[in-house]
């Protein structure tokens, strides 16, 4: 402290300035090192297989909840389904989904939570399956989420993929249903590899535009939909 007392104001400001610069450079160096370490591992690549055992996932939705909660399911266990929910809930700006069948309540809860957080959610789904018993598409629409569906009754929108923040792809055989998650032999791949993400971005945008009612005309003579 005596050293600082003996310094002039100008000298003290110089020392403080150098300290600030050193701090900023240190933070930048740490950020650079973090990026290098991440880049050395390459883009995210993860594979999930189903069926997945039923465990408690409440902690993914409520950060302040005390555990164990009152539900009868095992706690503190990571499964393919909990990992899938974690990836979905990692969205910060956008979530784009092409989903054939969507009736899983926990996945619907995750999407609604993202919407509540301000994440822009867009959904393209199948014309027929969006109205089957248990479908969560109606709940998404009721919450104000933008949903479009395949216009033609002759084909199905059979994709099952999602894009998180435009950089993370979630894709596989898994329908977003309870049966698929808990009973079926299914697979999901999660990746941030740009060469794989980009084509799915293009496919989503193509289907989103093709499913826009404003771009379609209904031919009354034969009941077919024509652009």
Curated annotation (Swiss-Prot):
It is a single-pass membrane protein. Its EC number is 3.1.-.-, 3.1.4.-. The chain crosses the membrane at residues 15-33. Residues 1-14 are mitochondrial intermembrane. It catalyses: a cardiolipin + H2O = a 1,2-diacyl-sn-glycero-3-phospho-(1'-sn-glycerol) + a 1,2-diacyl-sn-glycero-3-phosphate + H(+). GO terms for cellular component: mitochondrial outer membrane; mitochondrion. It is found in: Mitochondrion outer membrane. Pfam families: PLDc_2. It is an enzyme of class 3 (hydrolase). GO terms for biological process: lipid catabolic process; meiotic cell cycle; mitochondrial fusion; P granule organization; piRNA processing; spermatid development. GO terms for molecular function: cardiolipin hydrolase activity; metal ion binding; protein homodimerization activity; RNA endonuclease activity, producing 5'-phosphomonoesters. Homodimer. Belongs to the phospholipase D family. MitoPLD/Zucchini subfamily. This is Mitochondrial cardiolipin hydrolase. It comes from Danio rerio. The lineage of its organism: Eukaryota, Metazoa, Chordata, Craniata, Vertebrata. The gene is pld6.
């Amino acid at each position: 402290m005596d050293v600082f007392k003996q310094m002039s104001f100008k000298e003290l400001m110089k020392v403080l300035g150098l300290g600030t610069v050193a701090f900023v450079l240190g933070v930048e160096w740490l950020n650079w090192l973090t990026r290098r370490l991440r880049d050395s591992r390459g883009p995210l690549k993860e594979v999930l297989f189903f069926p997945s055992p039923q465990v408690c996932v409440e902690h993914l939705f409520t950060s302040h909840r005390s555990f164990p909660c009152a539900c009868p399911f095992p706690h503190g266990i990571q499964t393919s389904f909990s990992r899938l929910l974690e990836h979905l809930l990692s969205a910060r700006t956008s979530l784009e989904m092409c989903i054939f069948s969507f009736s899983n309540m926990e996945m619907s809860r995750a999407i609604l939570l993202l919407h509540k957080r301000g994440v822009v959610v867009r959904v393209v789904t199948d014309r027929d399956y969006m109205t089957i018993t248990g479908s969560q598409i109606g709940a998404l629409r009721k919450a104000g989420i933008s949903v479009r569906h395949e216009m033609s009754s002759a084909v199905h929108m059979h994709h099952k993929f999602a894009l998180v923040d435009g950089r993370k792809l979630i894709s596989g055989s898994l329908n977003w249903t309870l049966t698929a998650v808990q009973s079926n032999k299914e697979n999901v791949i999660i990746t941030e590899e740009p060469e794989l993400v980009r084509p799915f971005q293009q496919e989503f945008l193509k289907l989103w535009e093709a499913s826009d009612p404003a771009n379609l005309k209904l031919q009354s003579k034969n009941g077919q939909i024509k652009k």
